[in-house]
């Protein structure tokens, strides 16, 4: 069984705020950063923790803790997979050319890059596959900037690990803008 940590308690000068998060420390340690991420003159706390790990999956979670008011209580905002997907789809789209085993990455109506997945064509069965960009996600903090790295993969109906493109244009890096509990990819 994996060791599981449960709950986060933020203690601000004796005022405690509890957040019901759980995570496994089996693979990576959680990381905590303090900076003024939204440039409002007040420092926030960023908590990066393991969200999911397995064959073809490595997801980190990003949570920002913000001092709510003079009471000393904190509130937590998580950059959820749903929000990440909405933000990604505002910037990028995909076109698939099965005949040439290509995945075209579209930005602003133009092909930004072409990912060749011919090497994984033996996994392609009955026309079933899925383009995935939510299973390989990591974060890093540099000064007051939050950076997110993600990879695009092709998942097929065999249910095994997907074909990734880490060295062939399948990696994406974004600045994650945070303001008033909202996250945006830039």
Language-model features and meaning:
Residues 5-22, 64-79, 115, 179-182:
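Surface-exposed loop/turn elements that mediate protein-protein interactions on large endomembrane-trafficking
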Residues 28-37, 135-142:
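Beta-propeller blade termini
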Residues 37-49, 143-151:
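Acidic/hydrophobic-patterned starts of short beta strands in beta-sheet-rich repeat architectures
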Residues 42-99:
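Extracellular-facing segments of soluble proteins and assemblies that are Gly/Ser/Thr-biased and enriched
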Residues 75-167:
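Short aromatic loop motif centered on NTY/YTY
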Residues 164-186:
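Long, compositionally biased interface segments
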């Amino acid at each position: 069984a994996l060791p599981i940590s449960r709950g986060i308690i933020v203690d601000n000068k004796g005022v405690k705020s509890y957040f019901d998060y759980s995570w496994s420390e089996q693979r990576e340690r959680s990381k905590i950063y303090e900076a003024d991420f939204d440039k409002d003159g007040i420092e926030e706390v960023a908590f990066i923790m393991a969200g999911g790990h397995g064959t073809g999956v490595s997801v980190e979670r990003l949570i920002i803790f913000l001092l709510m008011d003079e009471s000393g209580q904190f509130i937590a905002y998580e950059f959820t997979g749903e929000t990440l997907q909405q933000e990604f789809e505002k910037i990028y789209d995909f076109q698939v050319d099965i005949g040439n085993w290509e995945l075209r990455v579209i930005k602003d109506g133009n092909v930004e890059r072409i990912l060749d997945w011919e090497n994984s064509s033996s996994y392609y069965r009955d026309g079933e596959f899925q383009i995935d960009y939510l299973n390989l996600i990591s974060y890093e903090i540099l000064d007051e900037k939050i950076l997110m790295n993600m990879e695009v993969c092709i998942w097929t109906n065999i249910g095994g690990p997907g074909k990734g493109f880490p060295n062939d244009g399948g990696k994406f890096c974004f600045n994650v803008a945070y303001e008033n509990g909202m996250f945006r990819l830039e």
